[in-house]
Amino acid sequence: MEKLASLYHHHLATLQARAQTVLARHQLDALLIHSGELLTVFLDDHDYPFKVNPQFKAWVPVTQVPNCWLWVDGVNPPKLWFYSPVDYWHNVAPVPESFWTEEIDITVLRNADDIGQLLPSQRERVAYIGYAPQRAQDLGIRADNINPQSVLDYLHYHRAYKTDYELACMREAQKTAVIGHRAAHEAFLSGMSEFDINLAYLTATGHRDIDVPYGNIVALNEHAAVLHYTQLDHHAPSDVRSFLIDAGAEYNGYAADLTRTYSAQSDGAFALLIKDLNQEMLALIDTVQAGVRYTDYHIQMHQRIAKLLKSHQLVRDISEEAMVEQGLTSPFLPHGLGHPLGLQVHDVAGFMQDDRGTHLAAPSQYPYLRCTRVLEPGMVMTIEPGIYFIESLLAPWREGELCQHFDWQKVDALKPFGGIRIEDNIVIHDGRVENMTRDLNLA
């Protein structure tokens, strides 16, 4: 904990420096960052699960408490109004005492509506960051200072560069997720249903289903062809062929995002395809370095997918280069290579080229790529190639001048397996890449 306290001290200094810069640039006095508010279910008396403002948890690891406020001026210690009501109906989070609290000026807020009386009275040059704009208006924040885009652009852009504290938190999230993945794999081998595999994952990680950073994808057989499958059947299929799990964890608000695919049989075409895709993925990661645009690695992965499709005789009589140029790899890999990772699973500013918000869209050929930035030290990315057998994407290729290049018998034989996705989380360093996932020996 002492090490984390030291890392947090330097993390806070970095955030303070960023705050000073953005406040001076936009002639603002302070940022007022709101943790968020509870949203009540329509025509009911209970609330949706609370999700904290990511810009709030960047400063303090308070992730489950609504109605908290941070006042940041970049010079003085950030002031936190921590919501702790007198309430016997609901659990009330204790006022924090942890590795980070000596750095923050904490005041207890008993009544959420009292915040207006407690904030500094001069708010004409204060920017509100949060998802309750009406609350900001009620506090006297000017309309053009409610989530000002230029301020958000600056904050989002620099969030790509993780501090050592953030990297430490993300490594802890990896450890938890890896424990869950191993438990889920054992549950799969024992013949459990998707629903029960998911329970095994949550139990092993100590998460509730509302605590994981995104809805777990636990897919058997053809369900793996649905990229964001979250149905969770209660009954295992009579013939189990494959298992894809895309599931993460959180630590102090920072996410892990891991995917693995397994074959029920250790031999056969599908098992070999998993093995070979894994090798191509690791080979690609070995080439990753700072100074290269992420888009280039996405295109390189399509070239590697073309190589696999040819070597497994799913596509024939056409060069690998022509396969990529003609788009034959796209129905097998319809999503991007990966995305920035951090406080959010799909972390912000993947397309942002500078801290003033200059946007570089994904290439038209690959519209679902989530990052076009040049990789730099401190960035954390996912690398998650896949090969899927999705009929709605394959159907247009069953006719036309290129259809003869597909071995449809072999393609159709793999459709009952759904597809493959393998995902690691990597850190870009100066001169090397850290694979946080493989460092924990998750094969």
Curated annotation (Swiss-Prot):
Cofactor note: Binds 2 manganese ions per subunit.
Keywords: Dipeptidase, Hydrolase, Manganese, Metal-binding, Metalloprotease, Protease
EC number: 3.4.13.9
Catalysed conversion reaction: Xaa-L-Pro dipeptide + H2O = an L-alpha-amino acid + L-proline
Ligand binding (Mn(2+) 1): D257, H339, E384, E423
GO biological process terms held by the UniProt record: proteolysis
InterPro entries the UniProt entry points to: Creatin/AminoP/Spt16_N, Creatinase/aminopeptidase-like, PepQ_N, Pept_M24, Peptidase_M24B_aminopep-P_CS, X-Pro_dipept-like, X_Pro_dipept
Listed cofactors: Mn(2+)
Entries under SUPFAM superfamilies matching the protein: Creatinase/aminopeptidase
One cellular component (GO) term of this entry: cytosol
Annotated positions binding Mn(2+) 2: D246, D257, E423
Molecular function GO terms recorded: aminopeptidase activity; metal ion binding; metalloexopeptidase activity; phosphoric triester hydrolase activity; proline dipeptidase activity
Pfam families the UniProt entry points to: PepQ_N (PF21216), Peptidase_M24 (PF00557)
Function: Splits dipeptides with a prolyl residue in the C-terminal position.
Family classification: Belongs to the peptidase M24B family. Bacterial-type prolidase subfamily.
Stored NCBIfam families: PRK13607.1 (NF010133)
Name of the molecule in the record: Xaa-Pro dipeptidase
Species assigned in the record: Pectobacterium carotovorum subsp. carotovorum (strain PC1)
Primary gene name: pepQ
